[in-house]
Amino acid sequence: MRLGVVTLFPEMFRAVTDFGVTGRAVKNGLLELQTWNPRDFTHDKHKTVDDRPYGGGPGMLMMVQPLRDAIHAAKAATGDSAKVIYLSPQGRKLTQQGVEELVKSDSLILVCGRYEGIDERIIQTEVDEEWSIGDYVLSGGELPAMTLIDSVSRLVPGVLGKKASAEQDSFSDGLLDCPHYTRPETLDNLDVPAVLLSGNHEHIRRWRLQQSLGRTLLRRPDLLENLALTDEQTKLLNEFVE
């Protein structure tokens, strides 16, 4: 998968390219990431990338010309089919379903805003979709972009090694994940549930599913509203409640 990022702080994306799951994906050629800095497209000695908004008000906006030229350069390098995404509080909220939609694209260009944002006409003419990671304010689009990259890359074939690793993540089936345990069997008088030590794979599967359903009910009941539970899931959830 090819990823382009338009950002004033390309150094931040070393966290993606040099570490963890995404770093291994880049090293193994499963993920290609390139950055474009609007400062490199300025024409003044100060490399100015901000400008005053029409109508006044506090703060500055990203200057149109350097930002637009950076986006055009990213498009030229990544391909005309690349989907351009602007990370924005006004965008569609990123969910696992959204991640599954985005991973179907061969290439994405992520535009990271700074200051008070970007000119609305850039959004109208250059951006295909706006995405948000939540209803709160950040200093820029870099952290949301890294969040999106990390979540999407986990679904790229070969990145996690085992397909089941992604399938068992929280939200992969619309539910929160079940509890997990490792050694020792007893920690501060708390024991690993006996079913996980039984070796009975069917019992373990049902226990994990029931715990996943129960945890979702207790912590994120809103998720259950959008799910059509199977007969087995309904039975296990009823048993959990009882």
UniProtKB/Swiss-Prot annotation:
InterPro entries: Alpha/beta_knot_MTases, tRNA_m1G_MeTrfase_C_sf, tRNA_m1G_MeTrfase_TrmD, tRNA_m1G_MTases_N, tRNA_MeTrfase_TRMD/TRM10. One of its GO terms (cellular component) is cytosol. Keywords: Cytoplasm, Methyltransferase, S-adenosyl-L-methionine, Transferase, tRNA processing. It catalyses: guanosine(37) in tRNA + S-adenosyl-L-methionine = N(1)-methylguanosine(37) in tRNA + S-adenosyl-L-homocysteine + H(+). The keyword Ribosomal protein does not apply. Its EC number is 2.1.1.228. One of its GO terms (biological process) is tRNA N1-guanine methylation. S-adenosyl-L-methionine binds at residues 113, 133-138. Belongs to the RNA methyltransferase TrmD family. Homodimer. This is tRNA (guanine-N(1)-)-methyltransferase.
